[in-house]
Amino acid sequence: MTEQTNSSDTLSNAGSRTPTAIDAVAEAFTQNLLTLDPSFATTLGIPGHETEYADYSPAGLESMAEAMRETLERLEDLQPVDDVDRVTLDAMRERLGLALEIHESGWDLADLNNIASPAQDIRAIFDLMPTDTVQAWEHISGRLHNVPDAVAGYITSLRHGAEQDRVAARRQVKIVMEQASKYAEDGGFFDSFTSGAALPDGAALPEQLQASLKENSDAARAAYRSLVSFLETELLPAAPEKDAVGAERYALFSRQFLGSAVDLEETYAWGVAELDRIIAEQEKVANQIKEGASVREAMDLLDADPERQLHGTAELQAWMQELSDRAVEELSQSHFEITGPMRKLECMIAPTNEGGIYYTGPSEDFSRPGRMWWSVPEGEDSFTTWKETTTVYHEGVPGHHLQIATATAASDTLNSWRRNVCWVSGHGEGWALYAERLMEELGYLSDPGDRMGMLDAQRMRAARVVFDIGVHLELEVPERWGTGTWTPEKGYDFLKQNIAISEGQLNFEFTRYLGWPGQAPAYKLGQRLWEQIRDEVRSREGDAYDARTFHTRALRLGSVGLDTLRRALLEN
């Protein structure tokens, strides 16, 4: 597509735009998607699919692919009538076309890792289901009843993948075995989630419902035990020892997470240089914290500062909520457009102990607010604010919550596929990392400790670029960090030197990067593009440039691939 124009016209259409033929195709695809993937309807807070799951079998994957093919065929004969249409057409062709490439490669039959695969998704949807009424618990019981079929379909796909030499690495198989075992054990997720289930006022559920919850929870536990058995007896023996996926497969997944094809070796070299630059910044801040201190010494001083310590998850949650509420209140007054429904953001401690921090968006009508979740590793009960202030901004406002809630609220302009379905890591995570730097520019990280935390997060994302591309493509290790070519073992030591997190979190991140190739660099590469676009727009507009207007205009596009974003904001 070369017709796209600057999306500034999009806002002028707000409230008056009439849906087009291209919007109708996007809406039809979205409705089809909700039928094929009912859990996604729950994610969006759309009623009508509360007990169902997607078909995770090869037949289900093919049904999804066929829906994409039909949608692309329908778009072939349509012409865009405005800027919104041009972006929709560009984005759908890129996203659906790439998804079909991955399907045709067969790698969707090997979807298994420690963070974002059906092994986690089948369980995680319960985190988003209401628990405040009898009917809500009936829906939960119904979905628990369907866990065995969902797991069975998933096992069938993994088995078919193995027959085609499409298998995740042994490391991923083994960690998912551990996770699935924990979900299924006594006191594990399914047991603890349903035992003692009650209404918010403490009222007991009807006896028949309690019995069905117990029966269906036990069935879900048995299903996950069957997954563990399959992984151990069938998939593990077929799984390759090697973690590196190689250049061809990596390039495919990099495009999936970026929406752009980048020169991987140039990007790797940029990542090495960016890491060096951030370390130099950290060294200056360390000297501000204590003259002559190294970065590590400065961090130790910050860790030991009682004013920056939090004890227990309750204290962590309360601190997160207070900081988040303050950011929403202050930033809405001058820097960003934050409307009433967008202002509610809940900070949560996740019901799992896997080590991640993540955001889940609001329901389409905002009746369920956006939430940031902290999955605290077992045994960890002390936290430091200097590291996590920037995390709250990343996950909340002006990061993911502002980004996703802005798109969700743009129903006057965007179709539901643009608002709620399309998600590109390079765009979304790039924005959140851009938002962290933006908070520094706005004066919210003037405290040297908080600024060190932001730089620590930036350093981690730059190190991810080096690690992820270096290890998966087996490139040469930069002289500063060692010799020879990258291996996972060298990579672990490298991460340990560059990511200031607990051992539990480090192990989680290390395994994540190895099992989710191309995703980790998307943060820093997306930030790079966001900053390039912002600077180019500012240069073009000169004194007329207004940051609030630019950010609103950009975020109202929704999440799109990085090439689509650049065309939408820069091409006339």
What kind of region is each of these model predictions?
Residues 1-572:
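N-terminal maturation segment of proteins
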